[in-house]
C-alpha cells in the first residue's frame, strides 16, 4: 500500500513538472530614436503581437515611480510605445533593468568622456598616417564593421534581431573595446593626454578608455543578471526585454548561460 502511494506521489510530481508553464524571455533589439523603418508604432505593434506580462526597459530605477510607472514620458521609441501599451493594457508591468546610475558612474570613474576623446584621437592619427600598419588595420576594420550594421538598422526589425546581425555586433564591439586598446596601450599619445574627473583627479586617455572597455562588460553582465532576477521572481510569465540592438548579442549570450537547466525559454519576437 505504501509502495502504491509512493508511486502515485512520484507520478504526480513528474506530471506537475511537465505541465508547469515555462517562462518566456523575448529580447528585442531596438532603435532608440524614431526612424522611418522603426518607430514607437512599430514597437507597439510588436508588443501587441506578443502580449507580454512584463516589459523590461533599458532604464534604471530613477526613471520610475515607486509603483513602476514612468516619471516622465520620453520621446524614445521604447518610452512612447510602452506608455501607449500599458494605457491599453494596464495590468502589464514595466520594470527597469539597467545598471544603476550608469551615466554618473562613467563620469565619476573617468571613462566618459575619455572614451569618445580616445576614439577621436585614434581617428585623427589614422587620417594623417601616424598609425603603424597593424594599428591602421585594426582601426579601419573597426570602422568598416559599422557599415553593414547601418544598412541592417535601416530595414525591418527582423533584420537587426537575428543571430547573423548579433554576430556582426559582437565583432564590432570586440574591436571597439578590445582591439582598439592594442593601439591605446601602446602609443604614448594616450598616456600623455588627460581628462579631469569631477573629483579633480586627472586620468589619462589610456586609463579612461580601459575603464570604458571594462564597463562594457560590467554593464551588460549586470543587465542580464537583473533580467534573470526579475524572470525568476515571475515564473511562467512572458517577459519582453527592450534594448538597443547593439546590446542584444551580449544580453542573449549571458541569458543563455544564466537560464541553463531552468524552465525558461529564450525566443525571438517573430517566433510563434
Go through each PLM region and give its residues.
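Bacterial Sec-dependent signal peptides at the C-terminal "C-region" and cleavage site
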Residues: 11-23
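Sec-dependent signal peptide recognition
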Residues: 2-8
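Proline-aspartate-enriched helix->loop->beta-strand connector
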Residues: 51-57
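Boundary/entry segment of secreted carbohydrate-active catalytic domains
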Residues: 20-37
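A cross-kingdom marker for long, charged
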Residues: 210-272
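Membrane-embedded segments
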Residues: 36-50, 62, 68-72, 84-85
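Solvent-exposed loop/turn segments at secondary-structure junctions
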Residues: 31-34, 60-64, 100-104, 245-248
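Hydrophobic, often amphipathic alpha-helical segments used for membrane interaction and targeting
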Residues: 78-232, 254
Amino acid at each position: 500500500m505504501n509502495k502504491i502511494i509512493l508511486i502515485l506521489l512520484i507520478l504526480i510530481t513528474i506530471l506537475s513538472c511537465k505541465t508547469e508553464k515555462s517562462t518566456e524571455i523575448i529580447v528585442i533589439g531596438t532603435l532608440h530614436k524614431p526612424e522611418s523603418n522603426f518607430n514607437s508604432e512599430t514597437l507597439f505593434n510588436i508588443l501587441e503581437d506578443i502580449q507580454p506580462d512584463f516589459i523590461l526597459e533599458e532604464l534604471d530605477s530613477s526613471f520610475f515611480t515607486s509603483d513602476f510607472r514612468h516619471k516622465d514620458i520620453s520621446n524614445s521609441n521604447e518610452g512612447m510605445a510602452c506608455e501607449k501599451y500599458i494605457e491599453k493594457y494596464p495590468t502589464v508591468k514595466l520594470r527597469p533593468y539597467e545598471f544603476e546610475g550608469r551615466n554618473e558612474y562613467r563620469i565619476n570613474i573617468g571613462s566618459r568622456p575619455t572614451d569618445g576623446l580616445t576614439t577621436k584621437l585614434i581617428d585623427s592619427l589614422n587620417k594623417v598616417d601616424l598609425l603603424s600598419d597593424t594599428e591602421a588595420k585594426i582601426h579601419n576594420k573597426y570602422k568598416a564593421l559599422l557599415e553593414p550594421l547601418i544598412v541592417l538598422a535601416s530595414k525591418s526589425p527582423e533584420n537587426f534581431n537575428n543571430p547573423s546581425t548579433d554576430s556582426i555586433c559582437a565583432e564590432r564591439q570586440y574591436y571597439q573595446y578590445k582591439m582598439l586598446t592594442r593601439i591605446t596601450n601602446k602609443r604614448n599619445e594616450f598616456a600623455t593626454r588627460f581628462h579631469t574627473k569631477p573629483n579633480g583627479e586627472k586620468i589619462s586617455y589610456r586609463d579612461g578608455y580601459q575603464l570604458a572597455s571594462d564597463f562594457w562588460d560590467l554593464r551588460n553582465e549586470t543587465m542580464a543578471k537583473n533580467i534573470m532576477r526579475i524572470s525568476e521572481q515571475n515564473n511562467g510569465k512572458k517577459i519582453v526585454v527592450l534594448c538597443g540592438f547593439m546590446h542584444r548579442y551580449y544580453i542573449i549570450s549571458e541569458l543563455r548561460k544564466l537560464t541553463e537547466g531552468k524552465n525558461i525559454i529564450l525566443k525571438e519576437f517573430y517566433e510563434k
